[in-house]
């Protein structure tokens, strides 16, 4: 009888074990939504940080883009006369606009990252930021498209207008300009993704929630 009594499990141990198992499973299930919510919240931050880097690189590379080219223009006797030609981004208004647009976008995104905590405290601020993001994306797109058109003209020229290409003489200038254009178009794509994400987030909120 004593052995039988000792082998029996106390009645209170089974409910306690079940409660511990339930608590453990509940904690694990609660951690998963929290992790997912954190990853979703980090998406705009990552996109904006990448857009800041891309536009800053585009503005810096184009702003520092310059090259000199020396050519023989005449020969007097046996002495060649040379002339040095220099090209800079300031010589083309489209490239100047490109630098300004990318610089504005980089500064804007940096400010949004620094003051993100203050912006998230107000409900209406999300809609305002979304509208500003659309303006910056349009500014970036027009700047990149304008600079790309001028870059294509510099690379291939225009036979009908008798404009000769210059990239055969200013190869480094054109190469650095291509890097700046690629970085700027990357910034446009990132801003587009940021706008789509912001639009989806704002669509989940009803109009009555905005103050």
Curated annotation (Swiss-Prot):
Residue ranges, annotated region (Disordered): 1-29
Membrane topology field: Multi-pass membrane protein
Residue spans, topological domain Extracellular: 77-94, 145-176
Transmembrane feature ranges: 56-76, 95-115, 124-144, 177-197
Biased segments, Low complexity type: 9-26
UniProt xrefs under InterPro entries: CASP/CASPL, CASP_dom, CASPL
Pfam families linked: CASP_dom
Disulphide linkage map: none
Topology, Cytoplasmic side: 1-55, 116-123, 198-211
GO cellular component: plasma membrane
Record's subcellular location: Cell membrane
Source organism, top-level taxon: Eukaryota
Alphabetical UniProt keywords: Cell membrane, Membrane, Transmembrane, Transmembrane helix
Family as reported in the entry's similarity comment: Belongs to the Casparian strip membrane proteins (CASP) family.
Subunit (UniProt): Homodimer and heterodimers.
Protein name: CASP-like protein 1B1
